[in-house]
A protein has these predicted regions:
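Conserved substrate/cofactor phosphate-moiety recognition/catalytic segment
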Residues: 1-49
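Conserved beta-strand scaffold positions in the cores of enzyme catalytic domains, especially
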Residues: 7-11, 80, 132-134
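Short, surface-exposed amphipathic charged segments that create phosphate/polyanion-binding patches used
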Residues: 24-25, 93-97, 146-155
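Glycine-rich phosphate-binding loop used to anchor ATP phosphates in small-molecule kinases
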Residues: 31-83, 118, 125
């Protein structure tokens, strides 16, 4: 979806893979840190030069949410497409499967911290966002189908107005605090 947009797109996981491929012997931790710093620089440049940039982040730390809030305070339109899972255990299982398929791992403590902090950071960003779409990606796809699951839209807010989905009663438990904050903020 983002690759088809007019914005530049940055995925730190893909950047880390390219770094490792170009630098045999580079460890995953160093590649991840380097890719993260590259993404931070790209975001700072996009803010300073008012460029369009789409990028992936967990929102689990403090730097990216701070930069996004800073961008919004400068009048830059900030849109977030947030994709969540039902629990940290679901994330841990997905990472385990990724590792089994040859991908990189993430320490369990980091997954749990990011799961908690990303939702808190999203709630804190709600007042300044031009648009937010929240998706539940908790459903696993049928391996026989060999395709990714289709995330379910949980909340869509545009310029302070909740525009969807029509039935907020089916909001999954993990997203209820976020939806409640949006309702309190935007009515």
């Amino acid at each position: 979806m983002f690759r088809a947009s007019d914005a530049d797109y940055y995925n730190p996981d893909e950047a880390a893979r390219r770094l490792i491929a170009a630098n045999p012997g580079l460890d995953q931790t160093t590649a991840n840190a380097t890719a993260w710093r590259q993404g931070k620089r790209l975001l700072e440049r996009a803010i300073n030069e008012r460029l369009d940039l789409a990028f992936e982040t967990t929102l689990g730390g403090s730097t990216m949410p701070r930069l996004l809030a800073e961008a919004a305070s400068q009048g830059i339109e900030v849109r977030i497409w947030y994709v969540g899972l039902a629990s940290p255990e679901a994330h841990i299982e997905r990472v385990r499967r990724r590792v089994d398929a040859g991908g990189h791992g993430i320490p369990e403590a980091d997954i749990r911290r990011r799961w908690r902090h990303s939702r808190l950071n999203l709630v804190q960003l709600l007042p300044v966002l031009t648009e937010v779409r929240i998706y539940d990606n908790s459903q696993d796809a049928d391996p026989a189908e060999a395709k990714a699951p289709r995330p379910m839209l949980v909340l869509h807010v545009v310029r302070g107005k909740i525009v969807g989905p029509p039935d907020l009663l089916s909001t999954p438990g993990w997203a209820k605090p976020i939806v409640a904050a949006a309702i309190e903020l935007h009515g």
